[in-house]
Each structure stands twice: as C-alpha cells, then as structure tokens.
Amino acid sequence: MSSHQQKQPCTAPPQLHEQQVKQPCQPPPPEPCVSQVKTPCDTKVPEPCHPKAPEPCHPKAPEPCHPKAPEPCHPKAPEPCHPKAPEPCHPKAPEPCHPKAPEPCHPKAPEPCHPKVPEPCLPKAPEPCQPIVPEPCPSTVTPILAQQKTKQK
C-alpha cells in the first residue's frame, strides 16, 4: 500500500512522462541510506576528540600567559616613554615650524605670480594692435608732407 502512495505524489506534480518520474524516484532511496550511515560515524569520532583536545589546551596556555606578560609590560614601558618623548617634541617642532613655513610661503608665491601673469599679458595684446593701426596712418601723412613740400617750393 505504501508503494502505491509514493508513486502517486511523484507522478502528479512533475507532469512529465511516467517513465522519467519513476526512474529518479527509485535511485534516491539507496543514496540517502549510504550517507546516513556515514554521518553518524563522522559525528561520533570528531565529537569526543575536538572538545577534549582544545578545551584543556586553550585555558591552560593563554590564561597564564596573557595576565603575566601584558600586565607588567604595559605600565613600565608606556609610562616613561609617553611623557619624555611627546612633551619635548610637540612644543619644539610645531611652534617654530608653523610660523616659519606658512608665513614666507604665502607672500612669496601669490605676490610674484599674480603681477607676472597679468602684466605681460596686457602689454602683449595692445602692442601688436598698435603697429597695425599706425601703418595706414603714415600713408595718409605722406600726402600732407608732399603738399607742405610743394608749398615751400
């Protein structure tokens, strides 16, 4: 009776050929049986080994090492180092550096740069324009000079 019930739900949902549905339904049962036998074996072997080995090792090694090494080292090394090194370094380095570096840099860079760029640009533009305009002017002046010369004669 149970075999009939299994075939009905398998053939109903897929709507594929009955032969194709029957084939995949039959091979799966033996596969899970093999994996089920392997899983209990794997879990039984590692379970007792893992908890027994790491549990006693971790608490015994790190517990005594951490409190003994860092406790005496931290208070002895950082206490004398911090006040001796940073105290004399901070006031000596930043004080003379700040006024010397930014003060001369600001006036030297912007002052010469601004007047040099706009000054040569302005005279360069009108210069070529002036010689072009006066060229036709001399031609108009020549006839005037000729008239003056004729009058003098």
UniProtKB/Swiss-Prot annotation:
Main location as per UniProt: cytoplasm
Keyword match Cytoplasm: yes
14 X 8 AA approximate tandem repeats as annotated region, ranges: 27-138
Region of interest called Disordered, as start-end residue ranges on this chain: 1-35, 49-85
A Pfam family reported for this protein in Swiss-Prot or TrEMBL: Cornifin
Superkingdom of origin: Eukaryota
Role summary: Cross-linked envelope protein of keratinocytes. It is a keratinocyte protein that first appears in the cell cytosol, but ultimately becomes cross-linked to membrane proteins by transglutaminase. All that results in the formation of an insoluble envelope beneath the plasma membrane.
Protein name: Cornifin-B
Species this chain originates from: Mus musculus (Mouse)
UniProt lineage: Eukaryota, Metazoa, Chordata, Craniata, Vertebrata
Gene encoding the protein: Sprr1b
